[in-house]
């Protein structure tokens, strides 16, 4: 039996090792560990739900890891504990994954108030791993009040993370395409906020991208006929490498959370996520039973 009290106990190296073991257990595909993983999850669930879940997506090279490290260090200075779940693509040939995102977060990875866990996608679509949601719950039970999920970063299919986080952020580059290109990306209509990174490299292009993306999101909203709980998705500029715009970004996040909470949409979104997770587990259980009994 896994001692879950270590996870919910005092923070430190012992807790970090317990978190790693718990996530490994939940990710295991071994049949003899399935019951133990379910028991662990059941024990941890009462201690979850108190964090803010932030999904971050964007194409490779957009600067997700750099941005997450700068943001994470900024939040830790404000008294937060930050967990980062990074998803690396798995090879379709060997099935392996480099799991190198953690190496791009040198300062954050050694901070005692941060926990970074790289996981392979293992062929799971939507930009996340099969057990990302469960890993997020483990981090919440351990007392991390901000949990960030960095997706694989393959482009238009990065949608699953939007269904398991409180806010979905899409990162873009200046000169990444006009507003029609933005509309083509199905992930755009799910974004609560678009961040244009590396704005310092070409200020004119960044300004143009901000205007084009904002107009594209307004167009998407008009045709979809939705208003996100008194929140109008927008685009902002940052430079993660220089640390410019990080405070403004977090202010937008806080504003979004306040509006969602006031209108009851925050709780509604969590309920929808729980329902989605339940059906995912039912589906996984049926597939497992079919494999066992042919």
Report each predicted region and the residues it spans:
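Hydrophobic positions on the alpha1 helix immediately C-terminal to the Walker A/P-loop
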Residues: 67
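Conserved beta-strand segments of the P-loop GTPase G domain that flank and frequently precede/overlap
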Residues: 118-119, 170-173, 195-198, 237
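Canonical P-loop GTPase G-domain recognition
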Residues: 193-195, 199-259
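Short, acidic/small-residue loops that bind anionic groups at enzyme active sites
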Residues: 170-182, 222-225
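P-loop (Walker A) phosphate-binding loop of NTP-binding proteins
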Residues: 59
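Nucleotide-state-sensitive switch-loop elements of NTP-binding domains
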Residues: 2-54, 62, 71-157, 164-170, ...
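Long, well-ordered amphipathic alpha-helical subdomains in the mid-to-C-terminal portions
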Residues: 18-21, 237-240, 248-294
